[in-house]
Structures are given as structure tokens and as C-alpha cells.
């Protein structure tokens, strides 16, 4: 099938995202890992087939101009991030809605996804820019965390939640989904707000999430150094200083 690549929506170092009719085309750079692309498509398919969540339907994995592409259903609407920017006076209302949607996701289970503790352990062991003492403390803390099997999106941020014209919602970008601990997913969302220079919103989010979920904030905070280390392993230069603030601690009390 031929796709029209004139309407570029997003550009990233490793991929561009296009809209072509009712399709979203995620086109990766040449020589991008075939394993990673197929794994992303597999994750999306597993969530689609094993839950009742509204997510883009996976349509095909193909090659376009010698580059790998994932083609999915296009979801019409505004993201929660866009709505917050359009109507700042309603930001608190949208943030509460955002948390409700996240808790809906976390109430589901997809048993064939990778386990979050296995993924995080591998990433921390691969991280070269922390001391052995910090690595040991992080791995000990990770090992002590409860083994849960909740569906964790892994990149649950307002730009990945689309509110459709009929006010139904859909969740996009499932590349990082795993099964694991609710608090880990919340810690990841919190850290995303921090990295986006939204510290006040990060704290507001954390309080709302704790209140709605019934989880003690301290339990979520215990995951933050772990999640920061995992993100540090990705090697984004612009994030390193912030992430080290959370990782470079000895006493994780």
C-alpha cells in the first residue's frame, strides 16, 4: 500500500510521525533496530487484544522508502496537554481526569508483557555513569518492591491521552508498556512533569494520584530514583542534570 507522507505531525531524532487519512504512520530512521520496532508493534497488539481500553488499532508493520514503519489507526481529537494549554483555567480539572484515566489503565492486566522489574534491572545494570554503590542500592531497592502485574503504560503523559470529539478518551504510544507496580508508573509520570519544567504540576499530580489511588506518596517516591536511573540509561544529554539529582543519593529512606 502507498502512503502519503506530506502531513508530518511529529519529528524526533529516531522517527517521524505522519497522518494519512485515518492512518498514523510512525516512520523510523534507516538502520533503526528491527527488533525494537517489532516489539513495539507486539506490545500494542497485546494491549489491543487483551483489554477493553480505547487505543489505536494496529494496522500493519511495513517498509516505506527502505525505512521501517508502524501504521496505526489515527485518533481524532485534542490531547490533554493541548487542552491544558488552550484552557489553563481548567488545568486542575484536566489533571484529575488524566489521573482517573491512568488508574483505569492500571486496573487492567496483560500477562504476556515484559515485567517492569526485569526491564528496570537490566537498564540499571547497563548504566555506566553511576557508582557501584549507587547501583547496588538501586538494585536492592528494586528487588524489595512488591511484584505486581498491573498494566503500566510507561510513558503516561498528557500528550499521550487524546480526548475525542464525543469526550471519549484514547491512549496512544504504547512502546514502553510493561506489567508491574502501579507506583512505578506514577513515579515515571511524575518524573516526566519534572523534566518538562512543570514542578508545581508534578507535585499536584502526585497528590491527586495518591488521594485517588489510596497509595501512600512515600511508596511512589521510593520508585523515583529507580525510574530516574532507567531514564538516565537512555542517554539524553538535556535530561542528565535533572536525573542525576534523583539518582545520586545514598540514603534512600
Residue spans for each PLM region:
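Short beta-strand micro-motifs within the conserved protein kinase catalytic domain, predominantly
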Residues: 57-68
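Active-site acidic catalytic loop and adjacent metal/ATP-binding pocket
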Residues: 16-19, 140-184
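Helix-rich C-terminal or lid/interface subdomains of diverse kinases
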Residues: 15, 188-253
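Internal "kinase-insert"/substrate-recognition segments embedded within catalytic cores
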Residues: 48, 89-116
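An alpha-helical support segment within catalytic cores of ATP-dependent transferases
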Residues: 107-154, 164, 245-253
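ATP-binding glycine-rich loop module of kinase domains
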Residues: 4-38, 45
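Conserved short submotifs of the Hanks-type protein kinase catalytic core
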Residues: 66-79
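Structural motif at the C-terminus of the N-lobe alphaC helix and the adjacent alphaC-beta4 loop
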Residues: 42-54, 105
Amino acid at each position: 500500500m502507498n502512503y502519503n507522507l506530506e502531513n508530518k505531525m511529529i519529528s524526533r531524532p529516531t522517527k517521524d510521525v505522519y497522518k494519512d487519512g485515518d492512518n498514523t504512520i510512525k516512520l523510523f530512521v534507516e538502520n533503526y533496530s528491527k527488533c525494537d520496532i517489532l516489539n513495539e508493534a507486539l506490545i500494542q497488539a497485546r494491549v489491543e487484544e487483551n483489554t477493553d481500553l480505547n487505543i489505536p488499532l494496529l494496522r500493519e508493520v511495513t517498509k516505506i522508502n527502505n525505512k521501517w514503519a508502524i501504521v496505526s489507526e489515527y485518533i481524532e481529537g485534542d490531547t490533554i496537554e493541548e487542552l491544558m494549554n488552550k484552557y489553563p483555567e481548567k488545568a486542575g480539572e484536566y489533571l484529575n481526569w488524566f489521573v482517573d484515566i491512568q488508574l483505569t489503565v492500571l486496573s487492567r492486566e496483560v500477562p504476556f508483557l515484559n515485567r517492569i522489574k526485569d526491564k528496570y534491572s537490566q537498564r540499571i545494570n547497563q548504566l555506566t555513569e553511576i557508582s557501584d554503590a549507587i547501583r547496588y542500592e538501586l538494585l536492592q531497592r528494586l528487588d524489595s518492591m512488591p511484584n505486581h502485574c498491573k498494566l503500566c503504560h510507561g510513558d503516561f503523559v498528557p500528550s499521550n491521552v487524546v480526548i475525542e470529539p464525543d469526550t471519549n478518551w484514547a491512549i496512544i504510544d504504547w512502546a514502553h508498556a510493561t506489567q508491574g507496580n502501579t507506583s512505578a508508573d506514577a513515579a515515571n509520570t511524575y518524573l516526566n512533569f519534572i523534566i518538562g519544567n512543570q514542578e508545581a504540576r508534578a507535585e499536584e499530580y502526585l497528590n491527586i494520584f495518591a488521594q485517588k489511588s489510596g497509595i501512600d506518596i512515600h511508596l511512589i517516591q521510593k520508585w523515583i530514583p529507580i525510574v530516574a536511573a532507567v531514564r538516565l540509561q537512555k542517554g539524553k544529554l538535556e535530561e542528565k542534570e535533572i536525573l542525576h539529582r534523583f539518582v545520586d543519593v545514598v540514603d534512600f529512606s
